[in-house]
């Protein structure tokens, strides 16, 4: 039984060592590839539509707030026949952002007190 445990520990150690070396070699090549792809992607990135601006040309182009992406909301003004679309933040996401901000500030105060 002791021999079996000893061999299993030895096997796991050698296996983890060999896999980390293979991963390290893969990571260096993969990092270079990803950096070149990200550079190309940043060039292609289009500008986002700010909040309360017209988004009828591209309904998925609204900018992100601190935590969530704004949503393109379309409506018909009273007495109008044409549709108006603007980037807006839904109320429930607005309240969630405010709550997260207050929790973050409260966490900072606690860290000061006990830190």
Swiss-Prot record:
Expressed by the venom gland. Keywords: Disulfide bond, Knottin, Secreted, Signal, Toxin. It is found in: Secreted. Residues 23-44 form a propeptide. Residues 1-22 form the signal peptide. Pfam families: Toxin_35 (PF10530). Disulfide bonds join 48-63, 55-72, 62-87, 74-85. One of its GO terms (molecular function) is toxin activity. This is Toxin-like structure LSTX-D2. It comes from Lycosa singoriensis.
């Amino acid at each position: 039984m002791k021999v079996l445990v000893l061999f299993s520990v030895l096997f796991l150690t050698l296996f983890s060592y060999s896999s980390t070396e293979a991963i390290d070699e893969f990571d260096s090549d993969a990092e270079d590839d990803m950096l070149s792809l990200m550079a190309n992607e940043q060039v292609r990135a289009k500008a986002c539509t700010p909040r309360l601006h017209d988004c009828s040309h591209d309904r998925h182009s609204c900018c992100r707030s601190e935590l969530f992406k704004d949503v393109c909301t379309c409506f018909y003004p009273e007495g109008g026949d044409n549709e108006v679309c603007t980037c807006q933040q839904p109320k429930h996401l607005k309240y969630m952002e405010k709550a997260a901000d207050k929790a973050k500030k409260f966490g900072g105060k606690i860290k000061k007190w006990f830190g």
